[in-house]
Each structure stands twice: as C-alpha cells, then as structure tokens.
Amino acid sequence: GEIEMLRSVIVFLVHIFSVIVFRVKLVGKENVPKEGAYIMCANHQSNWDAPILVSSTKRKMHVMAKEELFKNKFIYWLGDKCLVFPVKRGKMDLDSMKHSLKVLKDGEILMLFPEGTRKGMAKNGRAQNGAAFMALRTGVPVIPVNISGEMKPFHKVTIYYGKPLDFSEYKTSKPEKEVLEKVSKEIMDNIIMLEK
C-alpha cells in the first residue's frame, strides 16, 4: 500500500544519505539471515544508528526506541511510517514487550539497543535485559552489531555484523534473572568483540 511505498522511499533516501555523508561500510553482512525472525542488537552512539541500520537491511525491521523521541511530531510521524515503536525506559513496559514478541512470532526482525542509552558502552553501562528476555521467550537468534566510528558528516562509519548467537537451549516462558543477565552479558561481549 501507500505506507509501504512511502517507507521504501524513506529507507532508500536514508541509505543514499548514509553512504555519501557517513561513508558507511558494511562488514560481515553475510552473517545476517535472509529469512526468519531474529533480534538485531547494536551499540548506540547517535540518533542516526537506527535509520542507518534499517536502510542497510533489505528486509522489514521493527525498531524499539525510547519514548521521549516520540514527543517530536515529525519523529512520531516518521516512526509510525517506518515501524518504530516506543519503549518506556527503566521499567517493565508490557505494551512494547507484547509488540516485540508479536514481531518475532510473525517471523520479522526486531532491532534494539541493549545498553538502553547512547554512549552506554563507553561508560561501561550495564546491559538492560530486554533483548535477552525476547531471545529466551522466543528462541530466535540474536545478531550482534557494532557501529564503529563517529556519526559526523564525512567521517567513516563501519558497521560490523557478527555471527548469529543461539540461545534456544535456554528457551522458556519465564526466564530466570541469572540466565537473563548471563545472556545479556554474552550479547554485549559479542558486540564489543566485533570492533577488535
């Protein structure tokens, strides 16, 4: 429909912009599944991270973003067209949790930033457990992604895609805190290792 077409145009324009302005280079793209559900987890440096990752992925991707962004009317409009949905930070958000589980059950892609805040890794921020929870509830693979380089015009940005992480052995409807934290740490460790 019209929204799909508008979304495709927006994604295409962002892709052109990212290649020219941020000189984006993709490494390890062969690690990204061509079909089936998965969770993409990346480090978070700037508000350009999500648009650039979406435009670098051929498939439809649903993006979890902090609720505060949606106060901007343009971002709200854009997000609505580009499958971005809000999450309340620092507390259990059942609506975003249900939406995320539905996305994965429908065989689509969910993207989120496990640190929860920008520059989280630089400050050694502890990973939030949302990605681990989704992976353990659904058994879908997690693709770790590292965005390296500054998101400033004409600075080179490299996106490293890691091999899928399989946590299906821990799949359960009620993940325990210890397992959630173990899986969250493994996801973050894999994101960090990609830059080395």
Model regions and ranges:
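Conserved protein kinase catalytic domain
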Residues: 14, 18, 41, 54, ...
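Non-catalytic C-terminal accessory region of glycerolipid acyltransferases
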Residues: 1, 5-6, 95-196
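Catalytic core of membrane glycerolipid acyltransferases/transacylases, capturing the structured
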Residues: 6, 10-12, 19, 27, ...
